[in-house]
Amino acid sequence: MEDRFSTITNLHGDRKQAIFGVYVGHGGVKAAECPAKNLDKNIVEEVVGKRHELEIAEAGGSSCVTALVSEGSLVVSNAGDCRAVMSVGGVAKGSLVVPRGIGDAQLKKWVIAEPETKISRVEHDHEFLILASHGLWDKVSNQEAVDIARPFCLRTEKPLLLAACKKLVDLSASRGSFDDISVMLIPLRPVRIEKRGILEDVSSSKANSIARDIAISVTRDGRFRSYLARGGPGWLLSRIEEDKR
């Protein structure tokens, strides 16, 4: 199991800032564990003027995709065969797969770690972002992933983000993927939730403080190894309400 993921929300106490990442190791899991534990923190430190050099194993490497949400802006960076795909009014807008990666010291003459980075404003028709490893994208197209996840993510009563991730993982596995699969869903638009019988709008900035991420990883034989479900505001608040009953 060489896939790893990470999430940091409420950066510096600001609910409008968050960073997410999916990392895929090759030639050993340590190369994925290192950026998963350090890269997002290093990005945050770099933003505030601090520098910290990553220490990684000379053997092995990792591809990764990260998404930083800050004050209505979205910064997506990709190095390797992970991918970020955004649903824009139901249309898939995806990042490029670039021949880059972290580690792989023996290949540094040919493989660089500098990611491909895109910066955009989060608009009203930007619905959600899918971060996933190549275990998904080798078997599922960008538009197909959006089409499958969208009904789960745009439900009025409560988004079923974990179910959407599981659906995507199951589909890739059913098509013969023997690789590790990691999928993360990040809601970007206001979500309407029902609380005490009243429909309320929850903006994406507030959602960052409530909704973290969903990631599912599977082993090579297709069995679920672990999943982190801290889905969306509807998902969490529904469980808070259930606990109160």
Curated annotation (Swiss-Prot):
Domain of life of the organism encoding this protein: Eukaryota
Classification via InterPro entries: PP2C, PPM-type-like_dom_sf, PPM-type_phosphatase-like_dom
SUPFAM superfamilies named among the record's database cross-references: PP2C-like
Pfam family for this entry, one: PP2C
Range of residues in the leader sequence: none
Domain PPM-type phosphatase: from-to ranges: 1-188
Sample GO molecular function, one term: protein serine/threonine phosphatase activity
Similarity annotation: Belongs to the PP2C family.
Name used for this protein in its record: Putative protein phosphatase 2C-like protein 45
Organism name: Arabidopsis thaliana
Lineage, uppermost ranks: Eukaryota, Viridiplantae, Streptophyta, Embryophyta, Tracheophyta
